[in-house]
Amino acid sequence: MEKQIGILTAGGDCPGLNAAIRGIGKTAVSHGMQVIGFKDGFRGLMENRYVRLDNGHLSGILAQGGTLLGTSRDKPHKMLLGGNTVDMTNVIAENYHSHHLDVLVCLGGGGTAKNAYKLHQKGLNVITLPKTIDNDIFGTDVSFGFDTALHIAVEAIDRLHSTAHSHHRIIVVEIMGHRAGWLALGAGVAGGADAILIPEIPYDINVVAESILSRSRRGKRFSIVAIAEGAVSKEFAEKRNTLENELDKEKEKAKRNRLKRELKDLEVQHAGNTLKLSQELEKLTGLESRLTILGHLQRGGTPSAADRLLATRLGTACVDSIREGIFGVMIAARGDHSKPVPLDKVVNKLKLVPSDHPWVLSARDLGTSFGD
């Protein structure tokens, strides 16, 4: 009997999703399997909106950005319906079985892996592929989407150098990365940023300002500051760590809820932090400062050759796992090879930048400030 494969893309879009869909689909079809694509993530599976994917659908999509299936951030166990949040896991399981699926392949980041793992615990066969421009998925060397976003961020820094130099300005460039700084770090090093601020290394703004003034005294009348959106000051990091530690220790529900609210309020206070940092640097240095937020530019456009290669090989390796009956795994990139990693080793973890990572050490050797 032909195997039936379901595919969906969930979470934020990024370059390489279509390449991965193509890699899975064409390989599966070549082995006589049927492929169903569910539209708009887990919501499409819940609403039973789908398209049968054949070579006609999969032709010509390798170089396209985005995802032909559409995506959403809906969670099976927390689906927004009519203004209410409803657990639709059972409906999703029913639709899975109604299509006689042998496996559901979920392309997404850490949140998608977590949602897929919950479905696996309910008895569904699932496989995930690591997709995120943040490159923060635990268990894989790299995620597709990262390389393309890195190229976009580096090109932006290259372009900003000329205007910063011409006007003798500080230019602060906000780069995506909420809890991990891989993208800002890579772009900062490759783009020659003078300061790089990432979530893993809390900064002191006075140290950043002094590094800029030191450049100015040496005749360098401009500076580029590459900052991850989730970079925080030492003061903020201390407050957050205190609350998180208290939450971990607290058993009483009411107190836990209070601590969760305090953490949420603290994160709200952090919104707009990059603009505040840019303004504060202007005050501390006396140099004109401008902020550029790259935002969703980093998610769009044609995937790089590296992302096409990565997404394709992870897609074909996914079908190998399906044929071997290996489920409940993420297909990880390990060097030049692919490896199925159990989802329980992946979920609720982040791949963070270690303080001794070669990119960090090289940047420090070059005199780049991390604000610490």
Q: For each predicted feature, which ranges?
A:
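A cross-family phosphate/adenosyl-ligand binding-site feature
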Residues: 1-9, 20-100, 111, 227, ...
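Short, glycine-rich nucleotide/cofactor-binding loops
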Residues: 8-17, 176, 307
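Short beta-strand segments
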Residues: 8-9, 38-39, 70, 106-108, ...
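Short Gly/Thr/Asp-enriched flexible loops that form oxyanion-binding sites at enzyme active sites
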Residues: 20-24, 110-124, 184
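Short, acidic/small-residue loops that bind anionic groups at enzyme active sites
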Residues: 32, 38-39, 119-143, 150, ...
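Accessory alpha-helical/coil subdomains and C-terminal extensions
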Residues: 95, 103-108, 116-118, 146-164, ...
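Short, hydrophobic alpha-helical segments
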Residues: 161, 216, 319-326
